[in-house]
Amino acid sequence: MAKYVVTSAWPYVNHVPHLGTLIGSVLSADIYARYLRLRGRQVVFVSGSDEHGTPIELEARKKGVHPKELTDQVHEYDVKMWREYRISFDNYSRTESPVHKEFVMEFMKKLEENGYIFSQEEVLPYCERDKIFLPDRFVEGTCPYCGYEKARGDQCDECGRLLHPTELKNPRCALCGSKPVYKSTRHWFIDLRRVQDRLLKWLESHGELQDSVKKYSINWVAQGLKPRSVTRDLSWGVPAPFKGAEGKTIYVWFDALLGYVSATKELFIMRRGDPEEWKSWWWDSGTRTVYFIGKDNIPFHAIILPALFLASHDPYVLPWRISATEYLMYEGQQFSKSRRIGVWIDEALEIAPADYWRWALARMRPEARDTNFTWKEFYRIVNTELNDDIGNFVNRVLSLVRSRMSGVAPEPEDLGEHQGFVERVRRAAWAVAEDLEAIRIKRATEGILEIAREGNAYLNRTQPWKLLSQDREEGVRALSAALYAVKTLAHLLAPFTPDAADRLWSMLGLAGSVHEAVWDEWLDRPLPGGARIVRVEPLFQKLPDDFLERVDEIVEDARRRAREKRPPLLRD
């Protein structure tokens, strides 16, 4: 059986993540990892806090603290947030982890020994006012490819192109806004040209890559790869291990990409004290590695990371799948901390429970194009889908069992004409499984809704409350079929709304947790006869009728309450 390493892009810890970050990588990866576990697969789910690089150093400078003071606070807070959102990481690490730093340094030394690393003088922007070189986000300017005026020195957020700081037009220091001069400094480079042919062959032949990822990456590599600097003139980061590179650090993207491996290594050290077990995953050709990222991270995961693995000469498995989402917009605009546009993940929890956000964001997941988060759509999803469709069906069935069957599930028997409904539910359930297998997360939610809506229509059509009085055996058959659908919903909701799914499992009188019920053993089974439904409570609660009228007030209040709970360095 294949093993799976599931990863989500490492969030920067310069601030609290917003909803786009949540669905773009972390939540999508969690839904998939939970699904795999429910299919009985061996899974390692890892990510971590990306603490290094210019975004962190810039934010720390603004706050007048050392970067480590900032990242310690944000990392601890993010861990708390992931716990509240029920993100089921096996290990959520950090780039300041000693295991990670040692791994990155050893990996880079291996590349140098293999002949892929060389050094040369490079001319870079330098701020005479701040007395520092300006790598990456320390310099801003106009993108030479698309004309975006706020491109960074390493990448344009508008067109996604990787950049060199000297390519920017009208450059300016991100700290003071002054125009930089250009000075020479020595840096170490990885010669990507030496892996270009192997990389292109892999990209063209690998059938599991998402079409958008594959086309984008093939086009990029076919244009010719250039050597890329792996060092920076920064003190904050993983120290560069090359002779003569004292005082320099590894470029944050090479640093963070290797975190997927180091987090796995750290996991097995923590679990079993074994510093070598990670190799049985990352060096095993039977392992499938699945990366959940935003589309702006495609070149790093589809080109740079496999290039690093190829250059190591070790038997690393190359990416099996890369699930890259488009952007989630907020009421038609891009999320922006500085302009207070959007909702951040801690603020969201002040408005509604985690399950509501998990389901709503899965429904809005930007899989093929940018999608737009609106409060009107959030309100509809919570009140109509979670409550009127799913919650209402569950409540109707369980209430009938409580009131008309003394809370005892009937014994499974020949369901007669009601077997047709059961078969439709079974087919729909396995279609949801197929969608999750293929990482069609949004379509999987549509399949779940189809079962709930079909269930409500089935109740309206068969009216088991009347049948139980007129023809009790026929009424019991109808109710048994409906109970099968409710139990099926408990299984299917587990990756999406884990708390609600577990409550429903308990209400059905089933022992243990729904998250331990492997689908291949449980999904086709009816609810066991004699199962006692001792309590019935609403699975979800509706948002208030005046929610949309008061949403601005509700959001501002949520921001205030979330800000009060944040660590001191995150309260601005």
From Swiss-Prot:
Gene Ontology cellular component annotations, sorted alphabetically: aminoacyl-tRNA synthetase multienzyme complex; cytosol
Subcellular location: Cytoplasm
Catalytic activity: tRNA(Met) + L-methionine + ATP = L-methionyl-tRNA(Met) + AMP + diphosphate
Keywords associated with the record: Aminoacyl-tRNA synthetase, ATP-binding, Cytoplasm, Ligase, Metal-binding, Nucleotide-binding, Protein biosynthesis, Zinc
Molecular functions (GO terms): ATP binding; metal ion binding; methionine-tRNA ligase activity
InterPro entries given in the database record: Anticodon_Met, Met-tRNA_ligase_1, Met-tRNA_synth, Methionyl/Leucyl_tRNA_Synth, MetRS_core, MetRS_Zn, Rossmann-like_a/b/a_fold, tRNAsynth_Ia_anticodon-bd
UniProt motif 'HIGH' region: location: 11-21
Origin: domain of life: Archaea
EC number: 6.1.1.10
Binding site for Zn(2+): C143, C146, C156, C159
The protein's enzyme class: ligase
Cofactor(s) needed by this chain: Zn(2+)
Cofactor note text: Binds 1 zinc ion per subunit.
Motif ('KMSKS' region): 334-338
UniProt cross-references to CDD domains, sorted A to Z: Anticodon_Ia_Met, MetRS_core
Chief location: cytoplasm
Annotated GO biological process: methionyl-tRNA aminoacylation
Binding site for ATP: K337
Family (UniProt): Belongs to the class-I aminoacyl-tRNA synthetase family. MetG type 1 subfamily.
NCBIfam families (alphabetical): metG (TIGR00398)
Biological role stated in the UniProt entry: Is required not only for elongation of protein synthesis but also for the initiation of all mRNA translation through initiator tRNA(fMet) aminoacylation.
Full protein name: Methionine--tRNA ligase
